[in-house]
């Protein structure tokens, strides 16, 4: 009996160690999307980026969706059998810093192996920012893209406060410390400061587009880089992308650029974990009825935060 208990304890420690290691170094499982030649080991990795780009949205294996994408791109970089990557994007954009982090991860991957960007229904603003990191950009003719611009918004509720008899009391260390306070109007000096701040971020966005697409920044500034959205067909005409087609065409292009015409296309999905497995059973037993939109469809914008988003997405 004592020997059995010792064996069980040893097995438990071994399993716990494996699970702990997987949690420290999350790896994505591979789901075959398009099978290549029999016996071949070469692969094209399909990675998806969907919904609002935000470090506040939880990931499936990491702390956030940004962590997930960076981990997936790293896995593709480190796998010698992966000859190219297809990054499928369906996103309106999102936080500036989160978009920049993913863009840099795409560029880092591109330096090791070809990255083909496929823009699905929507790849606008921050979604296009991320796309610029790819070697070859492809979209559907009806894809909504472009929206090269930056937005910060806040609410002014001064009149509402007056109506209900509320007043905002602020103690501040400097004149700009509460410049987005909605309980009072902005001063001209505050407005100029915020506009200048927005334009600095816009110039960085514009510079990335100009560099990656080999287009004159001034020409972009005076034409299409004014926040307007473009169809995939229009984006091709303005050289914001390299081609139009379907997802299968992106696979073919990735195989061509990676020199692996017979490669198998694999999609990265979340790995199996005991915690997710048991959580699924717990949720199945929850009898509460919930009417909720998926988080990626609910605007998660916070007042005063800087976003790369089309104007129609901002509430």
Q: Language-model segments: what does each one mean?
A:
Residues 142-150:
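Active-site loop architecture of trypsin-fold serine endopeptidases
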Residues 129-136:
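Alpha-helix C-terminal capping segments
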Residues 1-117, 121-124, 136-140, 152-315:
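N-terminal organellar transit peptides
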């Amino acid at each position: 009996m004592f020997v059995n208990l010792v064996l069980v304890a040893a097995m438990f420690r071994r399993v716990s160690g494996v699970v702990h290691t997987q949690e420290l170094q999350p790896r994505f499982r591979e789901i075959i999307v398009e099978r290549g030649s029999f016996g071949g080991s070469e692969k094209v990795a399909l990675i998806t980026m969907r919904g609002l780009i935000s470090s506040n949205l939880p990931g499936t294996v990491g702390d956030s969706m940004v962590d997930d994408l960076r981990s997936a791109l790293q896995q593709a970089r480190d796998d010698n059998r992966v000859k190219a990557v297809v990054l499928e994007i369906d996103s309106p954009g999102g936080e500036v810093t989160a978009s920049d982090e993913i863009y840099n991860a795409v560029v880092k991957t591109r330096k090791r192996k070809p990255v083909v960007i496929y823009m699905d229904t929507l790849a606008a603003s921050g979604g296009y920012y991320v796309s610029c990191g790819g070697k070859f950009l492809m979209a559907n003719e009806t894809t909504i893209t472009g929206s090269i611009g930056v937005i910060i918004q806040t609410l002014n509720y001064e009149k509402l406060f007056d109506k209900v008899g509320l007043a905002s009391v602020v103690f501040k260390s400097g004149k700009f410390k509460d410049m987005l306070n909605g309980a009072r109007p902005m001063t001209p000096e505050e407005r100029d400061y915020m506009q200048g701040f927005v334009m600095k971020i816009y110039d960085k966005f514009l510079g990335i587009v100009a560099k990656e697409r080999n287009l004159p920044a001034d020409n972009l500034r005076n034409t299409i880089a004014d926040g307007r959205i473009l169809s995939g067909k229009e984006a091709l005409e303005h050289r914001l992308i390299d081609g139009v087609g379907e997802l299968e065409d992106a696979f073919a292009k990735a195989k061509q650029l990676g020199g692996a015409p017979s490669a198998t296309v694999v999609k990265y999905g979340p790995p199996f974990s005991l915690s997710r497995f048991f959580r699924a059973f717990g949720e199945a037993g929850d009898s509460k009825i919930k009417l909720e939109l998926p988080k990626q469809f609910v605007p998660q914008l916070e007042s005063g935060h800087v976003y790369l988003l089309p104007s129609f997405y901002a509430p």
